[in-house]
């Protein structure tokens, strides 16, 4: 074992950081995970302490080495994947953040987003960035920090501050400030990057008054960005050579290299991405156009639908309502429910994502009767995840005029067999669950390994992550459509309830 080589993936997520060591077969050799604090300064605000994130990453790197006995000099390369859009602004000299990281879920910049919309910028931003104007993306978060931290705008203009999404922050820390870089997939989520021209957009920067000096350099998803400073990697100087936002990394880890391939990751939120090839395709139905990945001098675009609440709805059942002891238990309860699926939960806790984009909507429940049981409620919560996925798959098919035949799935909630079967039923297509559910980390490892020759090419990768289980639809058409119609009514009613009174 002494001289076998490995790839390390650092997967910095919304609630925890992980380091995973993979071997040449794409198998997990060891992993380490550490949760960190979620900060909620006000209703709807979500923040993280960027230093705590960095500490958690250092801790899991150590943990992965300890668990496996692998030495730092056996790591051929490091791949990074991260929660996207989450925004850090820090002091170039001290390396200290000037404010907490504002998390992708946070709605604290919603008034800024509304202001941009009312000023008539929707079309312009969509054409340039592929995104809709929303507090979800980094642009308004950067503006908010520069507005709310005393002297920040002035310091930014003087070039004393740096901005980055979490990938940028981690590379900057790991290289001890030698590299201030991001990749196509993360840059595409800032709402500051022109995805057609592949550059920071001067006009948008001017509209938001964000100084260009604070922005990182944008690079491809598979190349050497820098090397670890030995004192941050237990004596090792290892190339950091692959980087992608978590959802794009999962697309790559699912081996969705062909246009028309679609994957869904059931994480905290649920994110459905379709590879649309080298042509940028703007959605007419409120999906996001983004960059899937850029590799070997080519850029592959993607359509994406974001669902804000998926796995976190199960966490809510566990922590908020205390209906289940642990997440897997939700499957048992759902199977014990014998109602006729007339209960609908719309988990719009932080608004509705694609294709509705209603940031004022809040969670609601419909169809309760005196006979409704805890089991029925848990089942309806699981079903809400599948209904939201159907909303997006239907929209993708409209946008691209293609019939999606199979959905590749991964992420924590993809382990729930009840949910996967109901997903197949309500979509009427096959659900292919990856054998290796670590597709996000695997994608980052693949990108890193390719750029240093650890794996030769995409064909070699295709042998490494086959389908683990296939779920085929078994519900008849009229029942499927009747259930989905009920969901559409529930969403409509939720939006009516959220309307602002005159």
From Swiss-Prot:
Sn-glycerol 3-phosphate binds at residues 14, 84-85, 136, 246. ATP binds at residues 14-16, 268, 311, 315, 412. The gene is glpK. It comes from Streptococcus pneumoniae (strain Hungary19A-6). It catalyses: glycerol + ATP = sn-glycerol 3-phosphate + ADP + H(+). ADP binds at residues 14, 18, 268, 311, 412, 416. This is Glycerol kinase. The phosphoenolpyruvate-dependent sugar phosphotransferase system (PTS), including enzyme I, and histidine-containing protein (HPr) are required for the phosphorylation, which leads to the activation of the enzyme. Activated by phosphorylation and inhibited by fructose 1,6-bisphosphate (FBP).
């Amino acid at each position: 074992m002494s001289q076998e080589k490995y790839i390390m993936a650092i997967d910095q997520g919304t609630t925890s950081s992980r380091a995973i060591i993979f071997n040449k077969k794409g198998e997990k050799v060891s992993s380490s995970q550490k949760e960190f604090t979620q900060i909620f300064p006000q209703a709807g605000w979500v923040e993280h302490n960027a230093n705590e994130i960095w500490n958690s990453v250092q801790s899991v790197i150590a943990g992965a080495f300890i668990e496996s006995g692998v030495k730092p000099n056996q790591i051929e390369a490091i791949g990074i994947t991260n929660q996207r859009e989450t925004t850090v602004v820090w002091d170039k000299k001290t390396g200290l953040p000037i404010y907490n990281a504002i998390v992708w879920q946070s709605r604290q910049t919603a008034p800024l987003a509304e202001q941009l919309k009312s000023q008539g910028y929707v079309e312009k931003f969509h054409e340039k960035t592929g995104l809709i104007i929303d507090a979800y993306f980094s642009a308004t978060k950067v503006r908010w920090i520069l507005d709310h931290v005393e002297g920040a705008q002035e310091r930014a203009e003087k070039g004393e501050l740096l901005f980055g999404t979490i990938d940028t922050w981690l590379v900057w820390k790991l290289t001890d400030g030698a590299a201030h870089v991001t990749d196509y997939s993360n840059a595409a989520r800032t709402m500051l990057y022109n995805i057609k021209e592949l550059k920071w957009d001067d006009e948008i920067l001017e509209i938001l008054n964000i100084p260009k000096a604070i922005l990182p350099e944008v690079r491809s998803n598979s190349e050497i960005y820098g090397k670890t400073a030995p004192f941050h990697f237990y004596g090792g100087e290892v190339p950091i050579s692959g980087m992608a936002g978590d959802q794009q990394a999962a697309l790559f880890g699912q081996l969705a290299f062909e246009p028309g391939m679609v994957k869904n990751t059931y994480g905290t939120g649920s994110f459905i991405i379709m590879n649309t090839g080298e042509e940028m395709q703007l959605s007419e139905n409120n999906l996001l156009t983004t960059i899937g990945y850029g590799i070997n001098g080519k850029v592959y675009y993607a359509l994406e639908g974001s669902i804000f609440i998926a796995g976190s709805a199960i966490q809510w059942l566990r922590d908020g309502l205390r209906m289940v002891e642990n997440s897997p238990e939700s499957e048992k309860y759902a199977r014990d429910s014998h109602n006729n699926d007339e209960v609908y939960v719309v988990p719009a806790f932080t608004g509705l994502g694609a294709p509705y984009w209603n940031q004022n909507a809040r969670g609601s429940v419909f169809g309760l009767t005196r006979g409704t049981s805890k089991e029925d409620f848990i089942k309806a919560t699981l079903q809400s995840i599948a209904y939201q996925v159907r909303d997006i798959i239907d929209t993708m098919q409209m946008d691209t005029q293609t019939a999606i035949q199979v959905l590749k799935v991964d992420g924590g909630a993809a382990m729930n067999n009840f949910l996967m079967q109901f997903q197949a039923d309500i979509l009427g297509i096959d659900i292919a669950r990856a054998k290796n559910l670590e597709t996000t980390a695997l994608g980052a490892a693949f990108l890193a390994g390719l750029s240093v020759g650890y794996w030769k090419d995409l064909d070699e990768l295709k042998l490494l992550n086959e389908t683990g289980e296939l779920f085929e639809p078994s519900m008849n058409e009229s029942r499927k459509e009747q259930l989905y119609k009920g969901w559409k009514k529930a969403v409509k009613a939720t939006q009516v309830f959220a309307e602002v009174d005159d």
